[in-house]
Regions:
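Alpha-helical transmembrane bundle of multi-pass membrane proteins
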Residues: 1-216, 220-437
Length: 437
């Protein structure tokens, strides 16, 4: 693409960083919930079912968001669609902070989830379309790095707000309650700060040159659906959707959503479990930086092979701790070590690779719609694992749950080996030609 090549390296990097800022909001909005669940449940007298709804309602919004994001971005453009997602984040953060009751809180969480769903599709597509082939993996991985920064930011905010909160405060002023006896409001509302930065900087980046070119060739949306039924493209969408949904059943989101609860079940205090979760966030972010550096050198599939292999070992070790830890005299240090190693293996492989692959493996004329379908599969998997994890921990026991996660890594490895091409260093047009064979 000539218009892409005419941009300086610094300009492309700036554009990619701005688009990746949406990932910070994605990560923050996803992870902040872990520090608010218990106090929200106590304040609004939630049943276990209602508590699950509080955790899962944003995922419903995300599923709706990914379902429409591809068509929105193909119709309105990548830039305007990112702007819509930023506005949704703003409405959600402010609304959650001032919610008068549980119903309002759920509504604003769903709105935020919609923003996550839209951004998780459009930002990686946008970055892949403005990036040169030799740097595309690194630049799209900025989005995953931003997600991990968002996770870490949420964990730090949760830890610091809880540490500084006066839980006995009787001051009725909302501003006081927000960081004291109703500190969940402050945790959720702090998302407004990075969102404003994202919202402002979107106005300083151009529309995707590839979208501008394809826009003139597209007659209506029915052509996209027709193109999806072409044999090669249909298989690309199928395999992309399968790796998206299977990746959610390998334990990563169970750790991110329920990490503090799992650590508490292992015997850590409330503050100790929250601090351990901060360590998880630090390892997640630093490992993603490493993945960003090596992904275009090592290759997508090599990272997945080694990383998922390590995940299996760590999941088996964690399952062993919960099954036979007492008999083997294993301390909580053993659990934390393999938790952190598991996060390292996940961040260096599937977490770093998934958005890169999904954003680059589809032809430009159907990229938005195809990635929406794969993204929908990803978020359905995320929702299911969010809802099923408490049941699995209780019914299968923590040991059985982590052994199951280890087993689910095997079909993922098979699909990556047999059906997904190595895309490192290839132009988007070369990748498209692979699926046409």
């Amino acid at each position: 693409m000539n218009s892409t090549k005419q941009m300086t390296a610094g300009r492309v990097l700036f554009i990619a960083i701005v688009a990746a800022l949406g990932g910070i909001l994605f990560g923050y909005d996803t992870a902040v919930i872990s520090g608010t669940t218990r106090i929200v449940a106590d304040q609004f007298f939630l049943t276990e079912l209602s508590k699950g709804w509080y955790v899962g309602c944003a995922l419903i919004g995300s599923i709706i968001g990914v379902a429409v994001a591809g068509m929105l971005s193909d119709f309105l453009g990548r830039k305007k669609t990112m702007l819509i997602s930023a506005l949704m984040f703003s409405i959600s953060a402010i609304g959650c902070a001032v919610s008068a009751d549980f119903t309002q809180l759920v509504i604003f969480r769903i709105i935020g989830g919609f923003g996550i769903g839209v951004d998780s599709i459009v930002s990686p597509i946008y970055i892949s379309e403005v990036s040169p082939a030799e740097k595309r993996g690194t630049l799209v991985s900025l989005y995953q790095l931003a997600i991990t920064i968002g996770f870490l930011l949420a964990y730090l905010v949760n830890y610091l707000v809880l540490k500084g909160a006066d839980l006995e405060s009787a001051d009725p002023a909302l501003g006081t309650r927000m960081f004291n006896n109703e500190y969940w409001r402050g945790m959720l509302g702090m998302e407004t700060i990075p969102d404003l930065l994202f919202l402002i900087l979107i106005f300083f980046i151009p529309e995707s040159p590839r979208w501008l070119e394809v826009r003139g060739q597209r007659k209506d949306n029915s052509e996209e659906w027709k193109a999806l039924r072409e044999p090669g493209i249909l298989m690309a969408v199928l395999w992309g959707s399968l790796i998206a949904i299977l990746g959610q059943f390998m334990g990563v989101n169970a750790v991110l959503y329920y990490g503090p609860e799992i650590f508490q079940n292992a015997g850590l205090s409330s503050e100790g479990s929250m601090f351990s979760t901060v360590l998880v966030g630090v390892v997640n972010m630093l490992t993603t930086v490493l993945a960003l550096i090596i992904i275009d050198k090592v290759g997508r599939k090599q990272l997945v092979w080694w990383g998922v292999g390590g995940m299996i070992v760590c999941l088996l070790a964690i399952g062993t701790y919960f099954a036979w830890g007492s008999a083997l005299h294993l301390g909580t240090g053993f659990l934390l070590t393999f938790f952190l190693l598991y996060v390292f293996c996940t961040a260096i492989s599937i977490s770093a690779v998934v958005f890169v692959l999904l954003s680059e493996m589809y032809p430009g004329r159907v990229r938005g719609l195809a990635m929406s379908i794969a993204g929908l599969a990803l978020w359905v998997g995320t929702y299911l694992i969010g809802q099923l994890t408490p049941w699995m921990l209780q019914t299968l026991t923590p040991a059985g749950t982590f052994f199951l996660f280890a087993f689910m890594c095997l079909p993922y490895l098979y699909i990556m080996w047999k059906h997904i091409p190595e895309t490192t260093g290839k132009t988007l047009e070369e990748i498209e030609n692979y699926w046409k064979k």
